[in-house]
Curated annotation (Swiss-Prot):
Pfam families: Aldedh. The gene is proA. It is found in: Cytoplasm. Belongs to the gamma-glutamyl phosphate reductase family. This is Gamma-glutamyl phosphate reductase. Its EC number is 1.2.1.41. Keywords: Amino-acid biosynthesis, Cytoplasm, NADP, Oxidoreductase, Proline biosynthesis. Pathway: Amino-acid biosynthesis; L-proline biosynthesis; L-glutamate 5-semialdehyde from L-glutamate: step 2/2. It catalyses: L-glutamate 5-semialdehyde + phosphate + NADP(+) = L-glutamyl 5-phosphate + NADPH + H(+). One of its GO terms (cellular component) is cytoplasm. The keyword Ubl conjugation does not apply. One of its GO terms (biological process) is L-proline biosynthetic process. GO terms for molecular function: glutamate-5-semialdehyde dehydrogenase activity; NADP binding.
Amino acid sequence: MTVKDYMQQLGRQARAASRDMLAASTDDKNRALVAIADAITANRELIIQENARDLENGRANGLEPAMLDRLELTPARFDGMIEGLRQVAALPDPCGEISDLKYRPSGIQVGKMRVPLGVVGIIYESRPNVTIDAASLCLKSGNATILRGGSEAIHSNQAIAKCIAAGLESVGLPASAVQVVETTDRAAVGELITMAEYVDVIVPRGGRSLIERISNDAKVSVIKHLDGICHVFIDDDADLDKAFNIALNSKTHRYGVCNAMETLLVASSVAEKILPRLATAYAEKSVELRGCDRTLAILPNINAAKPEDWDTEYLAPILAIRVVDDMTAAMDHIAAHSSAHTESIVTENYTKARKFMALVDSASVMVNASTRFADGFQYGLGAEIGISTDKIHARGPVGLEGLTSQKWIVFGDGEILN
């Protein structure tokens, strides 16, 4: 069978399964999620073995450390998959929810009903836990899904896929509601993103080159973000202890993720008070610092930042630092260099905080909090299927509601239009 024929087969099966999922009750979907969690738990040793196999192959093939980090199913990440499934099962089901119901002068009653998107294609690299995150959210929101993980995680994903299929079938839902592409041929991606007759939306998760290619070539809608160039701004009215903890956590909690801070902006009036302390803490964690001229005047032993540093998502222990005059200058820098993902201000000034929130045009804007909170789990969405920096359909972490749309519904009692 050719790759095209194989993908067409997956598409047909997904479209048929989407009709079954549309009819599935909330109880059916919740029981499926719990059954999948039980199957993942029962097969923990096998999944970890397959993940170790992928890691070994990745090291042999020269995968970068950031990619290997995303590939590894640590005990905490494994437990997180199971917790995520159970949490999504406990979330309210958005499907069938009716809102804005009102009577019109004609006598008809008009409202909106939340409904699944249909078939969601998800393309991602490295992280095998995305297989579970995506499956759980698509199932609970009534969608069928086709998952195309990276070739580097093929064995992990296949092991997880067997658990998903077993969980679905155990409660009478079709195994084809969640299908994992089992070929590593890159042509499968090209087929998936152009099957407009079967796939309603594509969610790509990966590097910039992957997402740009999908955005350019797809014949269906795409929910995406290109980069995670996230900023923390330490205002001159900041509590410096809060600022220290937020700036340290935003960068060093985990490097290879899109909500890690990549650029630190510091008001000039507090720069000499906070930067030396932060530099010592970053040095203890082996973070390379790259600063502007004003930063170098305070921290002469760090590297000079180049123009491209302000536009780089490092996904590594590297941090760019710029000293700015005030909040206006910080917002100007963010407007010029941000990827519209997440920005945070540290300040005790309520007026400034509200202004920053109103004028910074990113998917998540925070006050006195680490950028690492820009996550569907932390926002109470359960697992997230991705983060969107687009402004239409979904924005920010995409959870259950982001995987649905609304249709108009009309109730009448024999009314006709005169």
